[in-house]
């Protein structure tokens, strides 16, 4: 685990104008998947990936949840590591003391799995246990879902086929949910204990995505051995 030493207090510099401070609650990170990652992950899924049914470890009411094959994931770990470190680094840079120079964070992907969702499928509100970070990436959307969304937009609360993140309670200047209408290439990273849910859609076809659980450890620069591995 990466040890973050939170600041005991903040010192404000001289601001030229108004500067908003955001000390409370988690952020949701967004990036765009490389085209080659989308292509390789789709090919991996279509050939059966690892062949390991991952659904007993999950809560989704969906068509299929299957573990990624390591060979498909391996060429793309640099992208996911960079995003994870950027995400944690952004938070640490604002709220934590600087890391000692001899400590270098190292990203570990604990598990990664594909989710194949058909019309009527859904994922109940849930969190990811025994991890620090989780993520969702989108690989395929059902053809014609834009028409369903256009019709849903006429309703008072469009949510069909959306993913919703949930944290905290409602307040005057705080909304406890974030609804996202996903598209192919979207990649979201967030703390593993952030609740989220996926709503069903009606369009015939498949929405394909993947999720991962991620840990970050402290790797010492001098010998590359994680601190927790030392005797």
Locate the predicted segments by residue.
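Preference for bulky hydrophobic residues occupying beta-strand positions
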Residues: 31, 137, 212-214
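Short beta-strand segments enriched in hydrophobic/aromatic residues
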Residues: 139, 194, 214-216
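Ligand-binding loop in jelly-roll beta-barrel domains
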Residues: 199-209
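Non-heme Fe(II)/2-oxoglutarate
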Residues: 2-101, 113, 120-123
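Double-stranded beta-helix
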Residues: 213-231
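Histidine-centered metal-chelating micro-motifs
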Residues: 122, 193-197
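OB-fold and OB-like single-stranded nucleic-acid-recognition modules
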Residues: 85-88, 92, 96, 107, ...
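Catalytic core of non-heme Fe(II) oxygenases with the double-stranded beta-helix
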Residues: 111-189, 206, 220
